[in-house]
Amino acid sequence: MTTHTYSSPLAHASDTDFRAWGLELSDALTTVGFPKSADTGQINWATANMPLTSNTAAGYEIRYLNDSLHGSKTIYLKIEYGTVNTSLQRMGIWVSAASATNGSGTLSGTTY
């Protein structure tokens, strides 16, 4: 199993900060074997803006476990990136899991 160490400071005060931590986390997930699906509408880290409202996601990625069971026991993760608390500049990450996706960012099938 591949591992990855995340060592960047987790600042969340600007669009630049949001893009930096989001992209690094996104890249780390790819490195450890959670590739992005081909779903449309996924977050673009070059242009994403930090939400200015609490409990708001700026976008999402659909990822899946790329292992020997992918064909028979598929698990998709929807990872939403955003802001939990604007006054404290806190980043937010929401994760949902299911057995399928509709190809445009909605999880379907069995949910976990």
Regions found by a protein language model. Give the residues of each.
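Long, leucine/valine-rich, helix-dominated scaffolding and oligomerization segments
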Residues: 4-112
